[in-house]
Structures are given as C-alpha cells and as structure tokens.
Curated annotation (Swiss-Prot):
Domain of life per record: Bacteria
Catalytic activity: D-tagatofuranose 1,6-bisphosphate = D-glyceraldehyde 3-phosphate + dihydroxyacetone phosphate
Cellular component annotations (GO), alphabetically ordered: cytosol
Cofactor note: Binds 1 zinc ion per subunit.
Protein encoded by which gene: gatY
Name of the molecule in the record: D-tagatose-1,6-bisphosphate aldolase subunit GatY
Similarity comment text for this entry: Belongs to the class II fructose-bisphosphate aldolase family. TagBP aldolase GatY subfamily.
Keywords: Galactitol metabolism, Lyase, Metal-binding, Zinc
UniProt subunit comment: Forms a complex with GatZ.
Residues binding dihydroxyacetone phosphate: 181, 209-211, 230-233
E.C. number: 4.1.2.40
Amino acid sequence: MYVVSTKQMLNNAQRGGYAVPAFNIHNLETMQVVVETAANLHAPVIIAGTPGTFTYAGTENLLALVSAMAKQYHHPLAIHLDHHTKFDDIAQKVRSGVRSVMIDASHLPFAQNISRVKEVVDFCHRFDVSVEAELGQLGGQEDDVQVNEADVFYTNPAQAREFAEATGIDSLAVAIGTAHGMYASAPALDFSRLENIRQWVNLPLVLHGASGLSTKDIQQTIKLGICKINVATELKNAFSQALKNYLTEHPEATDPRDYLQSAKSAMRDVVSKVIADCGCEGRA
C-alpha cells in the first residue's frame, strides 16, 4: 500500500532520531515537486493540506494524485489534514481515504480541547487513521485564521501528559516559540520547555511554523524529540517569487509548462534543504 498513515512514519523517526517533513501543497505542480524530490532522495515525507487547500483542489482529486504519484515512484506517501477544526469535515475526508489527521482545537480551553480531540480520535482510530493535536497556540496566520501575539501561549509540559493520555492521540504538536508565516527576525525557541515536554510525553512531537528556521534550530529540536516538521510559507514564497521573476523577465511567456518550471525549481531547492535538515534522506 502506497498511501499510508503517519503513525508508522513518525514512530520510525522517533526511534531513528530524525524528523519527517510535512510539506503543505496547493496544486499539481507543488505536489510534483515534493514527491519527485522525496523519491529521488529516498526520504519519507507527508503531503499536507489545510481546509482551504482541500476546498481549492478537491479532496478526491488530491487523493487520486497522491495515490498515482506514490505508485509511479514506488514511494509510500501520507496525505495529512493540516489544521482541520470541524468533525464532520474530518469524518468525510477520512471516509474518502485520508489516513492522517490534525484536529486543531488549541484555541479552546483545556477541557474542551480534550473533549473535541477525543471525539476525533475515537472516530479516526476505527479507520486506522492517525491523529495529531496541538496543545498551546502559535501566532501568525494559517489559512484564514489569524492568531494575535496576545493570544499565543506555550505548551505546558505537565498538561501535555494529561492531554496525551486523555485523548489517545498519536502525535502532539507543541508551541515553543515558532509561528506560522516567515520571521522578521530569528525566533527564540524555548528548548528547555521542549526537553521538559519530552520527559513528560513519549509520543512523537510535532513542530509547526518551521518556515525560515535555521538548520541549527531545526536539528536541535529533533534532538529534543521533534519527529515531524511542518513547512508551508517558505514553499509558497519560493514558488511565487521565482514565478514573478520569470514573468517579469519573459513578459511574452504564455505556456504554463514553461513558466512554471522556474517556480518548481525554486521550491525544489527548499524541499531538498528541509529534507537534509530533518536528517531523513535515505530513510524511506
């Protein structure tokens, strides 16, 4: 089977001391870049999409593309629901064939977060679907959701254990100082908090908001228990800037098969770097 859940991927990463990158895609071209690069580097990767991406491209279309590309390259792939919030939406996509879910109820009070997440876990585990949830809240913008700095809060290590045990999740997304989007200056990550969380929780840990982080910071988080690294904005920026540059230099260009090549190449460089930073080359 080529379309897999993330559970085994992340458990392997936890045992092996590396991380699996989750790349947010938006269309055929961005998916091609991720899958082709991962296959060439024999690296495990997760194809992630926000609710907006699934609405834009279509759930059935994305599933068909992932399945076809996984078979074409003989490369197992996971397609993952990133930052999904609605149970009915998640259930519909799981029944369509998605096998990895992030239920994001991090904006809710602790007890309500547990209740919402457990409902999703109980449903998804019936279908052998892995579930990620977040404790703490990152700043920045993801899809149409904007979290202001005043609403940001970090993961409490002791609460993290209670949360994991009460919900039955397969992986835990933590808030240690990253944010969605690109950084104006290097963020100060709370490594001691991450180390403490690792001591309280034995699940694979997930880092959101990794676009623009230094190689050193990414690799330090992996040493302290991060097994999944999420990258979105950095991919979009590379793709769109290269496309703008090409069309500025070639205003006569009309064939997308030509003018999208530079955008794909720029994005491929980012994907290759993230795979190297995660230490997962040759691990598929």
